[in-house]
């Protein structure tokens, strides 16, 4: 049964901030790219290049995983915000716009995850991966 056959689950608080906050955050990060790295955390991260930004994203992701496994909901929420922020910094560093990702998510909507994953070409084998210096 595909995702399209399930009714949407209503939000508990529809007035709460939504995914548009990610678009605004991305715009802020993009604007700060040209800022002084001594004044802006985003500018400092971006000045280090995509490899270091990706490494920082990985570190934040692991912290998020640890809190999920530990069952610490409050810390998981905080770490999730960190992960989303660092993901957006990585997008800016790599030249990815949010709408690129939203379009890909829209393309996948209603397709079984197993079917969608099987349709992807093998982009990188495990043997080709390398540690970021």
Swiss-Prot record:
GO terms for cellular component: cytoplasm. It holds the Pfam family PRA-PH. Belongs to the PRA-PH family. GO terms for biological process: L-histidine biosynthetic process. It comes from Acidiphilium cryptum (strain JF-5). PANTHER family: HISTIDINE BIOSYNTHESIS BIFUNCTIONAL PROTEIN, HISTIDINE BIOSYNTHESIS BIFUNCTIONAL PROTEIN HIS7. It is an enzyme of class 3 (hydrolase). Pathway: Amino-acid biosynthesis; L-histidine biosynthesis; L-histidine from 5-phospho-alpha-D-ribose 1-diphosphate: step 2/9. This is Phosphoribosyl-ATP pyrophosphatase. InterPro entries: HisE, PRib-ATP_PPHydrolase-like. It is found in: Cytoplasm. The gene is hisE. One of its GO terms (molecular function) is phosphoribosyl-ATP diphosphatase activity. It catalyses: 1-(5-phospho-beta-D-ribosyl)-ATP + H2O = 1-(5-phospho-beta-D-ribosyl)-5'-AMP + diphosphate + H(+).
């Amino acid at each position: 049964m595909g995702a399209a056959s399930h009714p949407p689950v209503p939000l508990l608080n529809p007035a709460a901030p939504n995914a548009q906050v990610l678009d605004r955050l991305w715009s802020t990060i993009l604007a700060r790219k040209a800022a002084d790295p001594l004044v802006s955390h985003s500018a400092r991260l971006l000045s280090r290049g995509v490899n270091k930004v990706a490494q920082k994203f990985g570190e934040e992701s692991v912290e998020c995983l640890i809190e999920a496994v530990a069952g610490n909901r409050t810390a998981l929420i905080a770490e999730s915000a960190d992960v989303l922020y660092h993901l957006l910094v990585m997008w800016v560093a790599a030249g990815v716009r949010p709408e690129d990702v939203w379009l890909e998510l829209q393309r996948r909507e209603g397709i079984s995850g197993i079917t969608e994953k099987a349709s992807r070409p093998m982009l990188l084998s495990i043997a080709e991966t390398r540690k970021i210096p």
